[in-house]
Amino acid sequence: MGVLLGIAGLTVPLSVALGSGTAQAASACTAKAGPYQKQAEKFLGRPVDGKQSAADCRAIRSFQTAHAISPNIGYAGPITRNMMDLVGKQRAAGKNPNKAKKCPTNRGRIACVDLSRQLSWVQDGKKLVYGPVPVRTGRNGHETRTGSKKVYWRNINHWSTLYHVRMPYSQFFDGGQAFHAISGNVWSAPGSHGCVNMRTADAKKYWSLLRNGDDTFVYGRKPGT
C-alpha cells in the first residue's frame, strides 16, 4: 500500500490537469505560444501543433498552478519545460527508483534521496518499502549534503529557531539537515535550506518507518545547484 500511495502521488490528478477553480481564476490565460509549446502539449496529452489554444492554455496553467510556477498564465517557457522534465523523470521511476543501483542495497532499511530527480524512498535491501515520493532539497548555496548518513535525532513537533518555522515529523540525519513536512508545495522553487522537504503524508509515513540509527543515503545533484 505504501509503495502504491507514494507512486500515485507523483501524478497530477486529471481534474487538476484539465484545470478549473479559484487558483486558475486568479490569473489570465495567455494566447501566446511559448518556445516549449510542443513539448508542453506532448507532456499534457494535448494535440501537438505548436499553437496555443484555449484548452492548451488551461492545461498548461493548471500544471503551473499545481507545481507552484509563477506567473501561471499558461505560457510554455523554460521554467515550465524544466519542471515537466523533472516530473517526467519522477513518474518514470515507477516501482523501481533504484534501478541504477546508486542507493546501497546491503544495509537493510535505508532512506534514499536522489537529488537529481528530487525523489526519495525507503527500501529494505532490494525491496522497496515506501515511495518513491517527490521531495524538495537544498537550493543553490544551501545544498543537501551527499553521502552516507544515519538518523540521529527525531522530533515530531520540531520548531526551527534558525528559520522560525514549524518542521513537523523532523528526522535529522546530517547536522541541521532533516526529513520533515512542509505546508507549501514540494515542487516550488528555489528549494530548501538543506533539509529534505516532504508532503505531510509522506513525512508522517517516514516517521513511522525510520528510527534513530537507520541509514540514509543522499546522492546526485539538484537541478540548478
Predicted regions and their residues:
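A mature extracytoplasmic/lumenal domain signature
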Residues: 76, 80, 88, 117, ...
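Low-complexity, Ser/Pro/Thr/Glu/Lys-rich regulatory segments of predominantly eukaryotic nuclear proteins
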Residues: 88-96
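Secretory targeting and sorting signals
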Residues: 1-25
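Extracytoplasmic/secreted envelope proteins and their assembly/folding machinery
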Residues: 37, 41, 57-60, 81, ...
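Short acidic, glycine/serine/threonine-rich helix-capping segments at coil-helix boundaries
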Residues: 26-87
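A structural motif detector for short, solvent-exposed N-terminal "entry" segments of globular domains
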Residues: 98-141
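Exported/periplasmic cell-wall-interacting domains
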Residues: 95-108, 142-148, 153-225
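Sequence contexts marking disulfide-bonded cysteines in secreted/extracellular proteins
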Residues: 28-30, 58, 102-104, 113, ...
